[in-house]
Amino acid sequence: MLKSRHKMREAIFKSLFQWDFNKEEILEEISKEHIVSLEPNLQELAVNYLKGIRENIDVIDEIISKYLKNWTLERLSVTDRNILRLGTYELIYVDDIPIEVTLDEMIELGKTYGTENSGKFVNGVLDKIAKAEAPKEKFEL
């Protein structure tokens, strides 16, 4: 299941990455090509994640911006920006995923798709967000 969830996060990231270039496209439509190979229950979960991210994008971006030091969201690479969006969504809005799992998964996405510094950068920003913004119950998972 863990490897399957990793594939799901990867599909969500790829959908967000593509959507970032053309916000006129419907995110859920873009995602179809990326989530088709997932198990049916994970396809549904991926769609829920994407819907949640789209509906809360302004709040998510505001939270990320608050914890960027010497950067703006717009100056980040498309890769780092969308990994941070996915990670922030999971930290704030998904109750049953432990913080450490989210951080580890986002670091891996950063290492796979970003620059040599993406993993460390993503970890630093998401760690600050987790400590300050994540629901307290998540620290007990």
Curated annotation (Swiss-Prot):
Q: Which domain of life is it from?
A: Bacteria
Q: Which InterPro entries match?
A: NusB-like_sf (IPR035926), NusB_fam (IPR011605), NusB_RsmB_TIM44 (IPR006027)
Gene name of this polypeptide: nusB
What is the species of this protein?
Thermosipho melanesiensis (strain DSM 12029 / CIP 104789 / BI429)
The protein in question is named Transcription antitermination protein NusB
Q: Which GO terms describe its cellular component?
A: cytosol
User: What is this organism's lineage?
Assistant: Bacteria, Thermotogati, Thermotogota, Thermotogae, Thermotogales
This protein's UniProt keywords: RNA-binding, Transcription, Transcription antitermination, Transcription regulation
Q: Name one GO molecular function term.
A: RNA binding
Signal peptide feature range: none
